[in-house]
Design a protein with these regions (language model features):
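A generic structural motif
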Residues: 12, 143-144, 199
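A short small-residue
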Residues: 41-47, 136-141, 274-279
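Conserved nucleotide- and phosphate/pyrophosphate-binding catalytic cores
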Residues: 20, 151, 157-316
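Short helix-capping/linker segments at secondary-structure and domain boundaries
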Residues: 101-105, 137-144, 237-245
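Internal, conserved structured core segments that host functional sites
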Residues: 109-163, 167
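A generic secondary-structure signal for well-formed alpha-helical elements
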Residues: 64, 71, 99-102, 140, ...
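N-terminal Rossmann-like or analogous alpha/beta NTP/dinucleotide-binding catalytic cores
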Residues: 2-133
Length: 316
């Protein structure tokens, strides 16, 4: 029986933290067992806020190494780079021609930029159409998203329906896979973990950095069980075991943090070492991306030919 198709994109925005892992990255690894997956590095989307050659190159390679290190299997998941598949921007332009400005003004990213009084670039305004192209080229059954990202898939569905209505049935309508059960990981200060708050713990951190970050977790001196420590700790150990440990060491914050450090190190170390191994042979890692690009190109070019036939530009 053919597996259903799953697609997702990852913006190359820098080194991931454990919040990124438990909030999204881990799910891709889990889902690869039951889906035919496509995961692309969304480097053109990243151009809206990264306009430095060296940073972009470093981040793109970083995403590739990160996902290989956490267990993404190139035999099960096609990993490719958005900018290497020209059909993405080509289809986005075609979608632009059937999309109105008022419709794009409803996008969350545009509204956020307006509220912050930012100078809004055309890339930010137009990004829903590039995202629609990213999705619709591969006819996925599902697109994993958080509740706050559901609009991405809704834009793709609306665009597919409009194109189909104008030019005839061409695109399938993808379904959002709402990741309701994913963890919202607290940072070291109790707020949601984020690099912008500097309250994060890097996913591939060395032992000394893990120790420094965990020891810096904010605790309330009036608590018997430090809730910020516990909220992070339950990601790394069975909760029944944790309850016993936290009861035995109630009020002993330093000891509880030391236990978290050891549990976190046991979890992170294998992935950290695996990433180092991939980083020793960059050409080999790039071959994986090259193979993924080839597979993605075959699918995208086939769909693009169908689109061109429908809109009437294939006259030769």
């Amino acid at each position: 029986m053919l597996k259903k198709v799953l697609l997702s994109g990852v913006k190359p925005t820098g080194a991931p933290h454990i919040g990124n892992y438990f909030g999204a990255m881990k799910q891709f690894v889990d889902l690869q067992k039951e889906y035919q997956g496509y995961v692309f590095i969304a480097d053109y989307h990243a151009l809206n806020f990264i306009q430095d050659k060296k940073e972009m190159e470093k981040n793109i390679l970083g995403v590739l190494l990160d996902y290989l290190a956490i267990g993404l299997d190139p035999e099960k998941i096609t990993m490719f780079k958005q900018s290497d598949i020209s059909e993405h921007t080509e289809l986005a332009w075609i979608f632009d021609t059937i999309t109105t400005m008022p419709y794009l003004k409803r996008a969350h990213a545009f509204k956020d930029a307006e509220v912050k009084n930012k100078e809004i670039c055309v890339g930010t305004f137009n990004y829903p159409m590039l995202m629609a192209a990213d999705i619709l080229l591969y006819s996925p059954d599902v697109v994993p998203v958080g509740l706050d990202q559901k609009q991405h898939v809704e834009y793709a569905r609306d665009t597919a329906e409009k194109f189909n209505r104008i030019f005839g049935e061409t695109f399938e309508l993808p379904e959002p896979m709402i990741m309701k059960e994913v963890a919202v990981v607290p940072g070291t200060d109790g707020r949601k973990m984020s690099k912008s708050y500097n309250n994060h713990i890097p996913l591939f951190a060395e032992y000394e950095e893990i120790k420094k970050r965990v020891m810096g977790i904010v605790t309330d001196s009036g608590e018997g069980i430090p809730k910020n420590v516990y909220a992070i700790h339950k990601l790394f150990r069975n909760e029944d075991e944790l309850k016993k440990i936290y009861k035995e060491k109630e009020g002993k914050y330093k000891e509880l943090k030391e236990t978290l450090i050891e549990d976190m190190e046991k979890f992170i170390a294998p992935m950290r070492e695996k990433r180092k191994e991939f980083a020793k042979d960059i050409p080999k890692a790039l071959e994986i991306l090259k193979a993924g690009n080839k597979r993605a190109k075959e699918i995208a070019s086939k769909k693009m030919k169908e689109v061109k036939d429908k809109i009437g530009v294939n006259i030769n």
